[in-house]
């Protein structure tokens, strides 16, 4: 006689094993999926695409999502964040307002680069050297400071600079690429331009530029850090180890940005990874 109770028990046990296996498989798959949030800034674009290329070489599935910095900090602070990590946090100054708002719900994983600077930039042929000299040459600059997105920390710092130095200038909101295009046109025509700038950025290699002196100390020095959502390291330990070890010298970061600028985001990152595979694989 067929023992229905025994068969039912076997079926239940099999179902439980299959279910647990599916759960473990899903967890394993999720551990190999990483979502990187990044801003439209040259170093953020370059580093994020390098991370994508390097992790995909180890069978990770990587998604890149472009957002303004404020939205990135806010998204990563959510309990059910759609993102995992952000490689371009400028702290402790430039992104300080975002860290004050969201830092308690974020994890600082490490520092990629020390010595990030921001300020107002002019071509070297412009014969002024200080922010304090801008008002005397308002007409040559058309009364405009060419900026980037309003969500960027340097945008807020420049509003403070306008106030601190009592500048009769307007900050023009654009984007990182649009700002570079404006500098390129001005340099081509040898016209005057003042723009928000930062290092590291590939524009310093492409154009002969200089910072204007900032005697009031509006623009500080920062490090570039890796910020993640809470629980990222527990959920995806292999990916987390890679990001915690992600470090670049100034020379390496400039070379990476230059490769991306000249060859495109994916191709440039792949070329730089191939040439520096030992370095990058050492982060894994």
Indicate where each model-derived feature is located:
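A conserved helix-loop-strand patch within extracytoplasmic ligand-binding domains
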Residues: 103-150
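Short, well-ordered beta-strand elements
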Residues: 28-43, 60-65, 142-146, 243
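C-terminal motif of bacterial Sec signal peptides marking the signal peptidase cleavage site
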Residues: 18-22
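Pocket-flanking alpha-helical
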Residues: 48, 68-104, 181-182, 202-208
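Ligand-binding cleft/hinge of the Venus flytrap
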Residues: 51-59, 136-172, 274
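Short helix-initiation/N-cap motifs at beta->coil->alpha
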Residues: 41-42, 63-76, 171-182
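Short beta-strand->loop
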Residues: 105-113, 192-196, 205-220
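A bilobed periplasmic-binding-protein/Venus flytrap-type ligand-binding module shared by bacterial periplasmic
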Residues: 117-127, 222-236, 242
């Amino acid at each position: 006689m067929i023992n229905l109770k025994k068969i039912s028990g076997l079926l239940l046990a099999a179902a439980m094993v299959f279910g647990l296996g599916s759960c473990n498989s899903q967890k394993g798959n999720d551990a190999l999926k990483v979502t990187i949030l990044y801003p439209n800034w040259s170093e953020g674009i370059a580093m994020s695409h390098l991370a994508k290329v390097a992790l995909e070489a180890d069978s990770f599935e990587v998604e890149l999502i472009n957002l303004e910095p404020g939205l990135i900090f806010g998204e990563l602070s959510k309990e059910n964040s759609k993102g995992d990590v952000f490689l371009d946090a400028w702290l402790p100054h430039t992104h300080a307002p975002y860290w004050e708002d969201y830092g308690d719900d974020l994890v600082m994983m490490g520092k990629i680069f020390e010595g990030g600077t921001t300020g107002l930039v002019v071509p070297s042929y412009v014969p002024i050297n200080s922010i304090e000299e801008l008002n005397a040459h308002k007409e040559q600059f058309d009364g405009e400071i060419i900026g980037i997105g309003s969500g960027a920390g340097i945008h807020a710092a420049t509003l403070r600079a306008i106030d601190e130095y009592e500048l009769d200038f307007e900050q023009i909101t654009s984007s990182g690429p649009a700002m570079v295009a404006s500098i390129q046109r001005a340099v081509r025509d040898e016209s005057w331009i003042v723009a928000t700038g930062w290092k590291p950025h590939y524009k310093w290699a492409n154009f002969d530029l200089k910072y204007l002196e900032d005697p009031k100390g509006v623009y500080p020095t920062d490090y570039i850090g890796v910020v993640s959502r809470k629980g990222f390291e527990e959920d995806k330990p292999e990916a987390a180890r890679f990001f915690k070890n992600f470090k670049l010298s100034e020379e390496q970061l400039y070379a990476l940005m230059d490769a991306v600028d000249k060859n495109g985001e994916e191709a440039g990152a792949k070329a730089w990874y191939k040439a520096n595979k030992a370095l990058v694989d050492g982060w894994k």
